[in-house]
Regions:
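N-terminal secretory signal peptides
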Residues: 1-27, 34-40
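Predominantly soluble domains enriched in secretory-pathway, periplasmic, or organellar proteins
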Residues: 32, 41, 50-455
Length: 455
């Protein structure tokens, strides 16, 4: 994530001079280039381009020191959890640059939720009071152009009230909030990277949102005891207008979301494909799914009017359930079986694979996107044929990041580790190569220390 010049330690400690003038907000934004930091899925990063990210002094501590007036090497946007905020932090200094007010209001310091402008963004009741005062941000993701972040917009979720918020990159302020209809526990969020059909649209125009909790549809209390009526909605939000374009109802629950670099596919890892109402039922199956959405087909169905509408909402809803999508050549969705109650799904930077982490299984499933498209063309009968690797990497896999050199880094919440493993080696091992070295290293901080355990 840094170049050779950024790794060098200078012979002398630089002093604040004309070369390192205090940086204004406009200069900060003007000297920031975009970089995707696909870590735990909680942050989106900006890379500062001033002075090659020079380090401040000798040693490990010196390399993390950023003197007043200097830029950090990277800037990240983090979710703030129950604070309802998005936070901008510098790396490696760790300085908190700004707290962007989003969902929690009113805030006396910033005026968020007090001014007329912010009230209009947040939404109010007929009496003028705020509709909601709290929120729970989990994930922040930025808009794309030419396959990388362009810094125009950033989006975050509200898991409490099913809302999506947009932050304008040039202002670092929230400018729009949309409530997703018939959605509870909105968790997974990811923008598309280009249009699935028009090659000229090589930038983000959609944001995909996965509902974690299935609910009876319609959710009016009339069918709460009927398990078959419980479904979850996958929503597509227009990146510019922030209006909900369409929704796709599916079986089971959804967690996190990923989108392909060619714009053709979006996916969400799923748990509770059993459609159970109690924990024992939700965790009975050894495999759940990573459900893929064929964006072009869904939007053709919407345009053709092959939709329904849920009472109380004007958003068109297509049927993505298994029962309605048995023929791959006409299917809107593809349910790829993966173990067990998976938590995260992440796209490899080469655009070839989605990695679906097992959470209740010690595995990470590598799904070949070309094979998924082949399934939609009727070339594979079993969606499981799209899986090309499933290495055992440790207990409680959650999120996966990549280094651009063929290696994946997956967090393990039970083992309290980050494990480094090689994707190509995992594919070879899946084919029967017993000499393939899949797991390369582990970082263990289970007892407060950090240790490397190279295999």
């Amino acid at each position: 994530m840094s170049n050779d010049n950024q790794n060098k330690t200078p012979d002398t400690v630089p002093t604040l001079s004309d070369e390192h003038e205090p940086v204004s907000r406009r200069t900060f934004l003007g000297t920031a280039a975009l970089l995707g930091l696909s870590g735990a899925g909680l942050a989106t990063g900006l890379a500062a381009c001033k002075d090659g990210g020079k380090t401040a002094s000798h040693g490990a501590a010196g390399s993390a020191e950023v003197l007043p007036g200097q830029l950090d090497t990277y800037y990240g946007l983090w979710s703030g959890g129950h604070s309802g905020e998005v936070r901008v932090m510098g790396m490696p200094s760790g300085r908190e640059i700004k707290r962007i007010q989003v969902f929690n209001a009113p805030d006396a310091m910033s005026g968020w939720g007090i001014t007329n402008e912010s009230k209009k963004i947040l939404g109010t009741r007929p009496d003028g009071s705020l509709k909601y005062n709290t929120g729970d941000t989990h994930h922040v993701h930025g808009s794309y152009k030419d396959g990388t972040y362009d810094g125009k917009y950033f989006w975050t979720n509200d898991k409490v009230h099913g809302r999506i918020a947009r932050v304008r990159g040039e202002l670092m302020e929230c400018d729009k909030i949309t409530e997703l209809p018939n959605v509870q526990g909105f968790h997974g969020i990811f923008p598309d990277k280009r249009d699935p059909v028009d090659p000229k649209i090589n930038y983000t125009t959609r944001v995909f949102c996965g509902a974690e909790f299935h609910i009876p549809l319609p959710n009016d209390g009339s069918n709460m005891g009927d398990d078959s009526k419980y479904q979850a909605l996958f929503s597509c939000v227009d990146a510019e207008t922030m209006e909900v374009r369409w929704q796709c109802k599916i079986d089971g629950n959804m967690d996190l979301v990923a989108s392909s670099f060619d714009g053709k596919l979006a996916a969400s890892n799923q748990y509770n494909t059993e459609n159970g109402m109690m924990y024992a039922n939700m965790m009975s199956a050894e495999r759940d799914s990573c459900v893929f959405f064929n964006i072009e087909r869904i939007e053709k169905a919407v345009k053709a009017g092959k939709v329904t509408k849920i009472p109380g909402s004007n958003v068109p809803v297509v049927d993505g359930t298994k029962a309605a999508n048995k023929d791959p050549k006409t299917a809107l969705t593809c349910y790829v079986p993966v173990p067990k109650n998976p938590h995260g799904v992440n796209a490899s930077p080469d655009g070839k694979y989605f990695i679906c982490a097992g959470k209740l299984s010690p595995t990470a499933t590598v799904i070949d996107l070309a094979k998924v498209l082949d399934w939609f063309d009727g070339k594979h009968k079993d969606p499981r044929d799209t899986v090309v690797a499933e290495p055992e990497i440790g207990l409680g896999p959650l999120h996966t990041a990549f280094d651009g050199r063929g290696n994946a880094y997956t967090t393990l919440f039970l083992d309290s580790q980050i494990v480094k493993w090689n994707v190509d080696a995992a594919i070879k091992a899946f084919k029967g190569d017993k000499n393939a070295k899949v797991v390369l290293d582990r970082i263990d901080n289970g007892d407060g220390g950090v240790y490397s355990k190279k295999n």
